[in-house]
Every structure is written in C-alpha cells, then in structure tokens.
Regions:
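Ser/Thr- (and often Asn-) enriched beta-sheet segments in non-cytosolic proteins
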Residues: 19-21, 55-57, 78
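Residues that act as N-cap/strand-start positions at coil-to-secondary-structure junctions
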Residues: 14, 50, 62-64
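A short, structured loop/turn motif at beta-sheet edges
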Residues: 22-27, 47-49, 69-78
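Short, hydrophobic/aromatic-rich segments at coil-to-beta transitions
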Residues: 47-57
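Generic non-transmembrane alpha-helical segments
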Residues: 28, 32, 115-120
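Hydrophobic ligand-binding cavity/cleft-lining segments
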Residues: 1-45
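Beta-strand/loop substructures that line and gate deep hydrophobic ligand-binding cavities in soluble
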Residues: 58-119
Length: 121
C-alpha cells in the first residue's frame, strides 16, 4: 500500500480539528489508532503510521486527509485529529464535497475516544 506523505501539503486547508486526553500510555494508544485506520493491502488510500513521530495519516480521494497525533504527557496522552482538504484544484469544493464527513466528524471522534478509553484506561 502506498504511503501518505508525512508532511501536509503547503496548499492544504484544515477543515476540522479535535483533541482529547486519554489516561493511558502513548504506545498502546498509537498502536490502537494505527490498527483501526489501516486500510489494509490493496486499498486505494494512502496510509502512514510513523511510531517515531506518533502520527497516523490516511489520505484518499482527491481531497481527504485525516491526521491523528498522539502527544505524550505525564498522565497519558492527548490525541489530536485534523481533517484536511488536500485538493489541488477546486479547493473550495473540498469542503462542500466532504460535508457529510465533516458533519459526522465530531461524533466519530467522540466514538473513537470513548472506545480508546474503554480499551486502554
């Protein structure tokens, strides 16, 4: 499976951002996020899970990029999530085309955090 670029493209636009804290060690959090979002062999999505940078990136379609960062601290880790438009042309249409993903993103992030807490805390 092709890797997603580690660096966010210069023309990219952040559409939504979320964060939450989990009282668990960073490595199991990272591993769980990486496992959940790995599209598997043969997927058309680009995917990178970089444990040295604590980042998981899934990029697919012409506009969509999801970034997950695990930021360790003394009491666990903060999970940061960004939905990013990487559309190279028609950049304004990315928000419109992705409106369903953007509308459901808060609830999806909350489900992820609830699940991670149940699994790891």
């Amino acid at each position: 499976m092709p890797e997603a670029p580690r660096e966010r493209p210069a023309h990219a636009v952040i559409l939504r951002e979320f964060s939450a804290h989990i009282r668990a060690r960073p490595k199991p959090i990272f591993d769980s996020i990486a496992r959940r979002f790995d599209p598997g062999e043969g997927a058309r999505s680009l995917y990178t899970a970089d444990s040295s940078a604590w980042v998981v990136i899934v990029q697919g379609g012409w506009w969509y990029r999801a970034e997950y960062r695990v930021i360790p601290d003394d009491e666990g880790a903060t999970i940061e999530h960004a939905l990013v438009s990487v559309a190279e042309t028609a950049r304004r249409i990315g928000r419109w085309s992705g409106r369903k993903a953007l509308d459901t993103a808060p609830a999806e992030f909350e489900r992820l955090i609830t699940s991670l807490r149940a699994e790891l805390e």
